Amino acid sequence: MNSDVMPVGNLTRDQVRTVMTACAAAPPARNARPWQLVCTPTALELRAVLPLAEKSADVPAPDRRELLLSCGAALLNVRATIKVLGAHPAVRLMPDENQPDLLAVVQPQAGFAATPVDVALAEAIAQRRTARPPAGGIPVPMINRLRQAARVEQTWLAILAPDQLQDVLLRTPDGDARGHGGPAADVGAANAQESVDRSNVVVAVVGSFHDSPLAWLQSGQGMQRVLLTADAAGLTTSLLPHMVRATPTRGLVRTMIGGGVWPQAVLRLESPAQPSAVRPTSAAVAREEMHRSVR
């Protein structure tokens, strides 16, 4: 993360630090944060870092997709935090084809009143839940809220039935069933398999109507909005990227969710949850600073 912090637009230096802390709390990809948030006098620039900044041909498509999903999640955190600081985040995605590492430009514009939904999302950034909760189903109204959260970001949320999940797991290559840790960890094949028979666990797929770098960046924002909405409602959340890492299994998942949507991210949702005893330091700082900002 860029250490050169300065006022940006109508945001003070301290408010920009709050935004940067929230950005750093986004789920990483393969134990790395492939983005950098850069300050300019009028905007915050989200830029790709290695290996994402390398030529597309040098980075396998599945890896590039996962990295851009992570960048999209960071961008959603930036947008959500700017809103609770009283500004509107005007966003341009991939605005300059001559700067492929420039993923987004976010201009804070004064005069914005955050809604209760905005505040809940911003607070959820610091409330990543990984503790094992007791049994209890996820009600249909909650599933509908998560679907609406995905739609806000021009993405789609589908739920895999237990038999569909079992079929995908049987076809997932062993080499892709590894976990990667982090605040929203890939819990790996073992926990995915466990999800088949647990009534309080739902496996959901975030998808988009296109399959391009821009769609991956957009899908990362949809993924993060769903995760934060679930966290705010007390659900435990984690990522299962191995389920769509290999082309054959990704194609199978695409068929299962109707064939018209490209699966970009797979989420494991468990209900209900309690905040874990240990949180990432950056998330704890973000929560404290955000509470001060919205008082």
PLM region spans:
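Acidic, surface-exposed loops and disordered segments
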Residues: 1-295
